[in-house]
């Protein structure tokens, strides 16, 4: 079972993940700059690997139910590197959603604890959507 304490590698991993998201966002803002998007992807993957560990990351990306997401994220990355940033980013987005769809319930619980957002998420329609996915485990 993974340790919940924040050691230095996990802190660095979270920082790299944040920078990866930031660089990808900058790449989209700067008219789909393939260099920034590729750098963001590398930083994101390195950050996820350092945050959860090398072996758990390999197990996560090679699980049978995550295979479709891993392939589409990888092909999207290759499309970005080879000069098709718009199509690559679309394919990466699909892969990201497939890979990390199991984390949405955990994220929803975290967001409900933020003061203004928590009130918004407690509204009946939104709460019924969130309750449907509550109780699932995080897939790591």
Swiss-Prot record:
TM annotation in the entry? 12-32, 35-55, 71-91, 96-116
Q: How does it assemble?
A: Homodimer. No interactions with STL1, STL2, CESA1, CESA3, CESA4, CESA6, CESA7 or CESA8.
Biological source species: Arabidopsis thaliana
Q: Where is this protein found?
A: Golgi apparatus membrane
> What membrane topology does this protein have?
Multi-pass membrane protein
Record's keyword terms, sorted? Golgi apparatus, Membrane, Transmembrane, Transmembrane helix
What job does the chain carry out? May be involved in fusion of ER-derived transport vesicles with the Golgi complex.
The domain of life for this entry's organism is: Eukaryota
Keyword Ligase included in the entry's annotation: no
Q: What is its main location?
A: Golgi
The name on file for this protein is Vesicle transport protein GOT1
Q: Which GO terms describe its cellular component?
A: cytosol; Golgi membrane
What InterPro entries does the entry give? Got1, Vesicle_transpt_Got1/SFT2
- Keyword presence, Coiled coil: no
Q: Which gene encodes it?
A: GOT1
What does the sequence similarity comment in the record state about its family?
Belongs to the GOT1 family.
Pfam families per record = Got1
Query: What's one GO BP annotation on this UniProt entry?
Result: endoplasmic reticulum to Golgi vesicle-mediated transport
């Amino acid at each position: 079972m993974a340790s919940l304490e924040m050691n230095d590698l996990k802190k660095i991993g979270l920082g790299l993940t944040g920078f990866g998201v930031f660089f990808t966002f900058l790449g989209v803002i700067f008219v789909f700059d393939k260099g920034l998007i590729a750098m963001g992807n590398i930083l994101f993957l390195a950050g996820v690997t350092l945050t959860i560990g090398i072996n758990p990351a390999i197990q996560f990306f090679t699980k049978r139910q995550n295979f479709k997401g891993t392939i589409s994220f990888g092909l999207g990355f290759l499309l970005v590197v080879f000069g098709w940033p718009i199509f690559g980013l679309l394919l990466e987005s699909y892969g990201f959603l497939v890979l990390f769809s199991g984390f949405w319930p955990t994220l929803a619980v975290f967001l409900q604890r933020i003061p203004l957002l928590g009130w918004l998420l407690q509204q009946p329609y939104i709460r019924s959507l969130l309750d449907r996915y509550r109780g699932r485990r995080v897939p790591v």
